[in-house]
């Protein structure tokens, strides 16, 4: 492990390898490269000190260097203990950007690194957060509440909360009042994923959101592309790299049929699996049925299916009783943000055999075994390298524009959760059309007037569902 200077990465010697892959990724990320061209001279993020908590991948490296090109100072950590690509982290560290991320880091290190991305060398404070899952935001808000006298650190509900609370207490002791100062310095947060967005909306509804937030996840060019088309390619990639199991002919169960579930079902179906879906929402259940999938109860298929994938963003979706009833060598994995969709903690007292990194064989007393991928964390990033660069370009262009919005227009945003305006959503899409050879039909003035839009867009109302 290298700890020289202001970074922690697995091996700084991997920087050249990482740089070569970053160069390839840049050619597949036209949105971010266009942002550099458009904003590189004016540097709208000059003065921004961005704390970033998002998977430290090659694609994220292109995002980080775009933010820097637009004038920002950046400190970065991964939002998942298994998702870092060590050569990407090394390349970013070698470029001079402080990054704290190692694939397979411990939970203790994860929260230490989350603290480090707020600790600037000159003792200053972050003024922006770029988050994925909400952990960086939660770290600051929980600490500030503790400083205000609230009893928020006494009753951890999981091992991870116990570790998180210990790290907060350590910072409270080392820097009294720091959390409150850091909270008050934040101009805004941009949130990448469904789970983190849900956290922000809950805070907003309770009146506990102390700064503006932009919900990047619900930009159409994020949720309908990253969540769907990204998962469509990366889920099967992760299962294959982890298990080398042939999916054609297998029965696969996808728990949840939101955007991630839709992409996951398509991924498995495209690999030849016979896909069944479980769903609590009647609208999503009807969509699944009309897309040709059998919608079932997990309990009815748990003993016969071969592959189980959770996509819900909820907790305890696959429980210990389900896994106990599975056939021998069933594959169990998750592509939702957190690891609590699968009741992994209840498996800890069983026999675990590590097959290779992020692949474990777990044996039940009756002799049946399951293959657990990435310990129930994001398997597409733990067992593979995540979504392809092109689709991540759309997501990260949204992030870049959202950071510019909140940093440069503080008077236009109050302490609520916002979505990027439609014209910016359409802009993100436009930036990715040339790469695919797409030619847009242009409306005449008469046609545009007939449907009540501008010939240049936006073309849909805010409530339109794509």
From Swiss-Prot:
Alphabetized GO MF terms: adenosylhomocysteinase activity
Enzyme class, UniProt record, top EC level: hydrolase
Keyword Flavoprotein: no
Residue sites binding NAD(+) per the record: 193-195, 227, 256-261, 279, 314, 335-337, 380
Pfam families: AdoHcyase, AdoHcyase_NAD
Reaction catalysis annotation: S-adenosyl-L-homocysteine + H2O = L-homocysteine + adenosine
UniProt: substrate binding residues: 57, 132, 192, 222, 226
An annotated GO BP: one-carbon metabolic process
Chief place where the protein resides: cytoplasm
Annotated EC: 3.13.2.1
Listed pathway(s): Amino-acid biosynthesis; L-homocysteine biosynthesis; L-homocysteine from S-adenosyl-L-homocysteine: step 1/1
Entry-linked SMART domains: AdoHcyase (SM00996), AdoHcyase_NAD (SM00997)
Function: May play a key role in the regulation of the intracellular concentration of adenosylhomocysteine.
PANTHER family: ADENOSYLHOMOCYSTEINASE
Biological classification of the source: Bacteria, Pseudomonadati, Pseudomonadota, Alphaproteobacteria, Hyphomicrobiales
UniProt xrefs under CDD domains: SAHH (cd00401)
Protein name: Adenosylhomocysteinase
SUPFAM superfamilies per the UniProt record, alphabetical: Formate/glycerate dehydrogenase catalytic domain-like (SSF52283), NAD(P)-binding Rossmann-fold domains (SSF51735)
Known cofactor(s): NAD(+)
One GO location term (cellular component): cytosol
Cofactor binding mode and count: Binds 1 NAD(+) per subunit.
Keyword annotations: Cytoplasm, Hydrolase, NAD, One-carbon metabolism
Alphabetized NCBIfam families for the sequence: ahcY (TIGR00936), PRK05476.2-3 (NF004005)
Family: Belongs to the adenosylhomocysteinase family.
UniProt subcellular location: Cytoplasm
């Amino acid at each position: 492990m290298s700890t020289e200077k202001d970074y922690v990465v697995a091996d700084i010697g991997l920087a050249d390898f990482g740089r070569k892959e970053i160069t390839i990724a840049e050619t597949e990320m036209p949105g971010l490269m266009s942002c550099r061209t458009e904003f590189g001279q004016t540097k709208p993020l000059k003065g921004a000190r961005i704390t970033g908590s998002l998977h430290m991948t090659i694609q994220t490296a292109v995002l980080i260097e775009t933010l820097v090109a637009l004038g920002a100072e950046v400190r970065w950590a991964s939002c998942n203990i298994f998702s870092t690509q060590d050569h990407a982290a090394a390349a970013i560290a070698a470029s001079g950007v402080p990054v704290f991320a190692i694939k397979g880091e411990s939970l203790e290190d994860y929260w230490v690194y989350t603290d480090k991305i707020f600790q600037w060398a000159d003792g200053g404070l972050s003024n922006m957060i770029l988050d994925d899952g909400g952990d960086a935001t939660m770290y600051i808000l929980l600490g500030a509440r503790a400083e205000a006298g609230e009893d928020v650190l006494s009753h951890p509900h999981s091992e991870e909360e116990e570790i998180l609370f210990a790290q907060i207490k350590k910072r409270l002791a080392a820097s009294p009042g720091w959390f409150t100062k850091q909270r008050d310095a934040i101009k805004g947060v941009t949130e990448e994923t469904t789970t983190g967005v849900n956290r922000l909306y809950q805070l907003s509804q309770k009146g506990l959101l102390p700064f503006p937030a932009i919900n990047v996840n619900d930009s159409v060019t994020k949720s309908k592309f990253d969540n769907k088309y990204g998962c469509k390619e990366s889920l099967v990639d992760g299962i294959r790299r982890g298990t080398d199991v042939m999916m054609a002919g297998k029965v696969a169960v996808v728990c949840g049929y939101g955007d991630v579930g839709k992409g996951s079902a398509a991924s498995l179906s495209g690999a030849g699996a016979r896909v069944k879906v479980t769903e609590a929402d009647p609208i999503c259940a009807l969509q699944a049925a009309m897309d040709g999938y059998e919608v079932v109860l997990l309990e009815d298929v748990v003993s016969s299916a071969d592959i189980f994938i959770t996509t819900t963003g909820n907790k305890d979706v696959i429980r210990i009783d389900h896994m106990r009833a599975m056939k021998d060598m069933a594959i169990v994995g998750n592509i939702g943000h957190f690891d609590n969709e699968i009741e992994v903690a209840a498996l800890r007292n069983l026999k675990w055999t590590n097959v290779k990194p992020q692949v474990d064989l777990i044996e039940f007393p009756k002799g049946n075994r399951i293959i657990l991928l990435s310990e129930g964390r994001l398997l597409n990033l733990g067992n593979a390298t995540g979504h392809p660069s092109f689709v991540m370009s759309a997501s990260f262009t949204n992030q870049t524009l959202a950071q510019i919005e909140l940093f440069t227009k503080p008077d236009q945003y109050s302490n609520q959760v916002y979505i990027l305006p439609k014209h910016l959503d359409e802009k993100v899409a436009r930036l990715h059309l040339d790469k695919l050879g797409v030619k847009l039909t242009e409306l005449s003035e008469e046609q545009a007037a007939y449907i009540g839009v501008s010939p240049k867009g936006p073309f849909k109302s805010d409530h339109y569902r794509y």
